[in-house]
């Protein structure tokens, strides 16, 4: 029997079908609760929509989209000031300021959609294509024409069925996703230290010695609210000094996240002389630990090797709690590699509404996405 697939676009997590979370069981980043966090504490230049795909009356697919309007952004990243950066920022403002992401631009990995395992995937993807076109039409009618549509992030195998449907899209690959696989026989941080080669064990010891005097503290909701402004300033310092940025978080993002997600969201503060000088965040996603945003005082970070110590702390916690892997995501590839994370190449699809630009999308894309040169390390024996 040839049943028809349909779709429904939702503007609020409160309107999602009651059975939504059944499909999101294996990915916290598609649950109603997380989508509520996104909706209520998203970056100032981001609007989220959620798509349900149905077979007759049954929900068989769930999708997250994010619409970014970059003209509200003060900076695309302040670290690199040169002619190419100026050209890139001009191109962004004029030809790429309205971007529709199918997926989550705040995370790395396949957090775009989930389909029921018993349905015909190609048919669901075709319905997704129709839903995207409808959403673009709706946005245009509200005065927000989409310049770029991007479907992200997928492994080489995951992207194949999408390439078959979205034939006019350009397949791109940006920075890899840095993944730390935790061997099953590791139970403590010492197991990790013992596996390091002498050079990297010395690096570990040096970093830990440098962190003398720093107190690490798990922060609860009241603590996060108390230090909200300091936390945000530490985050913002790191974010605005990144070479490229398409959004900045809302000031209440971390407290709202903690309020809704509870123990699935962890925020650790780093104190020196009773002053908060850094923080990092972790999200429990089944047996996978996702690292999230962090921030630090630059003057202390260099002297105390704070960032490296945060990475070691994340590894130690994840081993102790029995997680299978840690998603260290993009950026700072070399230092993440030096603690044992391995690069996994990720792909996405992109198309531009302007036919001329779309014809030259590969060259245009290189302007928008700065290439990162880095050297992979292997810290293990």
Predicted regions and their residues:
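Short C-terminal domain-edge/linker segments immediately following a structured domain
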Residues: 38-41, 82-84, 92-98, 180-184, ...
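Active-site/acyl-donor-binding loops of N-acyltransferases
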Residues: 2-4, 67-68, 110, 154-155, ...
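A conserved beta-strand-loop-helix scaffold within acyl/acetyltransferase catalytic domains
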Residues: 3-82, 147-302
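Acyl-donor binding region in acyl/amide transferases
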Residues: 47-48, 70-168, 288-348
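Generic recognition of stable, solvent-exposed alpha-helical segments in well-folded globular domains
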Residues: 123, 127, 191, 199-202, ...
